[in-house]
Swiss-Prot record:
Reported induction: Circadian-regulation. Down-regulated in axillary buds within 24 hours after decapitation and then up-regulated. Down-regulated by the transcription factor ERF114. Down-regulated by cold. Almost complete down-regulation by sucrose, fructose and glucose, but not by other sugars. Up-regulated by heat and dark growth conditions. Isoform 2: Up-regulated by salt. Isoform 4: Up-regulated by salt. Isoform 1: Not up-regulated by salt. Isoform 5: Not up-regulated by salt.
Family to which this protein belongs: Belongs to the DRM1/ARP family.
InterPro entries, A to Z: DRM/ARP
Entry-annotated residues carrying Phosphothreonine: 64
Consequences of knocking out this gene: No visible phenotype. Drm1 and drmh1 double mutants have no visible phenotype.
Protein name: Dormancy-associated protein 1
Family matches, as PANTHER family: DORMANCY-ASSOCIATED PROTEIN 1
Ranges annotated as biased composition (Low complexity): 61-70
Stretches the record annotates as Disordered: 53-76
Tissue spec. comment: Isoform 1: Expressed mainly in the low bolt. Isoform 2: Expressed mainly in the low bolt. Detected in flowers. Isoform 4: Expressed mainly in the low bolt. Isoform 5: Expressed mainly in the 6 days old seedlings. Detected in 16 days old seedlings, axil, low bolt and floral samples, but only barely in leaves and top bolt.
Pfam families: Auxin_repressed (PF05564)
Keyword Phosphoprotein: yes
Keywords: Developmental protein, Phosphoprotein
Length: 132
C-alpha cells in the first residue's frame, strides 16, 4: 500500500520536495460523526432528505414536433433573371435604363435597334454602360 501511495504521489503530485513541505502533501481528514455532536447537547439533530418532482402535464394525444422555420429570403436568381419581379428594385431599373443621365447618352434601346446602328453605337453603348 505504501508503494502504491508513493507511486501515486510521484506520478500525480511530482517528486517529494527536498525539505519542508513533505508533511503538507497528504491531508487525512476524519469524517464528522453527527451522533457525537447530538450527545453533548440537549437537542437532537435530525436530518431528513427528500426529493420531489413536479407532476408533468401530458397532452391527451401525442403530436409530431414541428421544426422551426427561418424567414423566407429573397431568391437571388429570380431577381437576376427577372429584374422586374423584385419589388424592392422594380422602380430602380426603369429609372436607370429608360431615363438617360446625359441628354446625348444612348439608352438600352439605342444599343439594340438594328445591326448597322449597333455597330455605330457599340463604343457609345460600352462607354454609357461603363459610366453607370
Amino acid at each position: 500500500m505504501v508503494l502504491l501511495e508513493k507511486l501515486w504521489d510521484d506520478v500525480v503530485a511530482g517528486p517529494q520536495p527536498d525539505r519542508g513541505l513533505g508533511r503538507l502533501r497528504k491531508i487525512t481528514t476524519q469524517p464528522i460523526n453527527i451522533r457525537d455532536i447530538g450527545e453533548g447537547s440537549s437537542s437532537k439533530v435530525v436530518m431528513h432528505r427528500s426529493l420531489t418532482m413536479p407532476a408533468a402535464v401530458s397532452p391527451g394525444t401525442p403530436t409530431t414536433p414541428t421544426t422551426p422555420t427561418t424567414p423566407r429570403k429573397d431568391n437571388v436568381w429570380r431577381s437576376v433573371f427577372n429584374p422586374g419581379s423584385n419589388l424592392a428594385t422594380r422602380a430602380i431599373g426603369s429609372n436607370i435604363f429608360d431615363k438617360p443621365t446625359h441628354p446625348n447618352s444612348p439608352s438600352v434601346y439605342d444599343c439594340v435597334d438594328n445591326e448597322a446602328q449597333r455597330k455605330e453605337h457599340v463604343a457609345l453603348c460600352l462607354v454609357g454602360a461603363w459610366i453607370k
